[in-house]
Amino acid sequence: MSQPPVAVLGAGSWGTALAMHLARQGHRVRLWGRDPEAMAAMAEANCNTRYLPDAPFPPGLEPTADLDAALRESSCWLVVVPSQAFREMLQKLAPYRDDARVLVWATKGLEEHSGQWLHQVVAEEMGVNFPCAVISGPSFAKEVARGLPTALTVASTTPGVAERVAEWFHGERMRVYLSDDVLGVQLGGAFKNVLAIAAGISDGLGFGANARAALITRGLAELMRLGDAAGARRETLMGLSGLGDLVLTCTDDQSRNRRLGLALGRGESLDAALAAIGQAVEGARTARMAVSKAAELGVDMPICHQVHRVLYVGHSAIEAVGELLGRDQKPEF
């Protein structure tokens, strides 16, 4: 008897790449997207023609715009939609929920209007005891789609769920580590995007490798302070979903957040930079949440504050750098 299919909900680059990986692991995968024309084009071309045109789908991957068809009989729901669409997606899933299914999300960010972590949104929409997990780590869609080696972390507080999800993803080219620090895994994955914008701004200004290394290191200190105040574990933030994702996103131009920063550092406007990227840039939204969480928890996050000022207060990139460098001296730790 064949295994139940996996429903991957969100057919952007990351959702498509994860769907391809799961199909290569031998799973039947239904990749859902809301645009019928786009999904029909994927089915005809056997690839995601918009985001990953050079990565043909493996056997077992079925694109569809029919949500009922995607969810029917599925054992796992993998949600890979932008954070602002996360709650709406869960509301569509709620009528199908039962204890035999597992909800996994690979979305990075917080809910913008409420400031809630995504696990809090899951609890509100699906119930506090619904089996769920978050998967995150240093990973670019193009590399996962090509089957290049990748390591991720899956976190759940539901007994046995992290192990079950890890078994689905673990393979020759993907290693999956286990955690029960759901908050810590989300925190690193969300706020590193803001720091990647900062690193991009620095490089766009031509400030070089020294400045980039300083931003990554002091950015990690901001993540650690926020994690301490929020209740995350420090070792989580030193792992794949924290430091690993931070280094990757700050140093490689595959990162949309870094590319946004590069454009801003070179003097482009926010609107023009976002239009040129053409996909969701989670760090631009999360910058607001960083400032809000820092104020709520009484945490000093100067780099994130300066990114917010460049994005939304009208500060120039060079003004932001001056304010960071002009801060009072203090101990490193």
Swiss-Prot record:
Annotated compartments: Cytoplasm
Keywords of the record: Cytoplasm, Lipid biosynthesis, Lipid metabolism, NAD, NADP, Nucleotide-binding, Oxidoreductase, Phospholipid biosynthesis, Phospholipid metabolism
Entry-linked Pfam families: NAD_Gly3P_dh_C, NAD_Gly3P_dh_N
InterPro entries in the cross-refs: 6-PGluconate_DH-like_C_sf (IPR008927), 6PGD_dom2 (IPR013328), G3P_DH_NAD-dep (IPR006168), G3P_DH_NAD-dep_C (IPR006109), G3P_DH_NAD-dep_N (IPR011128), NAD(P)-bd_dom_sf (IPR036291)
Binding-site residues for sn-glycerol 3-phosphate, renumbered to this chain: 108, 137, 139, 192, 245, 255-257
Enzyme nomenclature, EC number: 1.1.1.94
Reactions catalysed, as given in the entry: sn-glycerol 3-phosphate + NAD(+) = dihydroxyacetone phosphate + NADH + H(+); sn-glycerol 3-phosphate + NADP(+) = dihydroxyacetone phosphate + NADPH + H(+)
Protein known as: Glycerol-3-phosphate dehydrogenase [NAD(P)+]
Native organism: Thioalkalivibrio sulfidiphilus (strain HL-EbGR7)
